[in-house]
Amino acid sequence: MIKLIATDIDGTLLKDGSLLIDPEYMSVIDRLIDKGIIFVVCSGRQFSSEFKLFAPIKHKLLYITDGGTVVRTPKEILKTYPMDEDIWKGMCRMVRDELPACDYFAATPDFCFAEDGGSPVFHLLRDSYGFEMREVDDITRLDRNDIIKFTVFHPDKCEELCTPVFIPAWNKKAHLAAAGKEWVDCNAKGVSKWTALSYLIDRFDLLPDEVCCFGDNLNDIEMLQNAGISYAVSNARQEVIAAEIGRAHV
């Protein structure tokens, strides 16, 4: 019996980078919650973005944000998985030196840091995704222990640009996953959306077989592989469809 449903957002429920969602989803989710199902929004988005997107039912949901690095209720943070400072600062320096066509940002549980308030990534995150943004002169000069995600950005081919140098340099020191054509997300090693879901499974004394997940991209693979029932949407990457062998595709 399914007791918890977790879904990705961008590419799964709506078009990437939108704050417009079909209102019918709200009705369906609300009915599921009324039947006792725990419903979890599980995305690479920031909490403020997820909270705005699901406004009509926002107080009834649980939230996994920033690619699995933050677990929270509408009112409080339950768990975070911060990155080692040397890792995210090293990533930042490498993007500057080796990937001049790319931009980047660093996320805390509540807002993101970027170095140019006029840059495309700053405006995209703030205006299209509804993120809380902070402009700083130099991310590597930040003295913080709450950076939970570092993300590389390119508008068309981020994964392609990161593959020759960046990904090989860091994929044994951190968890890296493409999240659409624009993003490569970097979490602490071993931390994915499934890590956060596992925390909730333990918290509510559930079994993986009592969990149902929906997703479309590489950062969804772990949760799709481990949930009792998983669904890849029709536009999912082929790697994602292949990963959830023997399960339904919608």
Feature locations, PLM:
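Active-site metal-binding loops of divalent metal-dependent hydrolases
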Residues: 9, 45, 215-217
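Conserved acidic, metal-coordinating active-site core of Asp-based
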Residues: 94, 101-214, 218-226, 235
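Non-catalytic pre-domain segments flanking phosphatase-related domains
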Residues: 1-7, 30, 34
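Active-site phosphate-binding/coordination module
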Residues: 20-122
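Residue-level signal for inorganic ion chemistry
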Residues: 11, 32, 67, 150, ...
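Asp-based phosphoryl-transfer active-site loop
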Residues: 3-18, 224
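Short active-site oxyanion
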Residues: 36-40, 59-61, 148-149, 209-210, ...
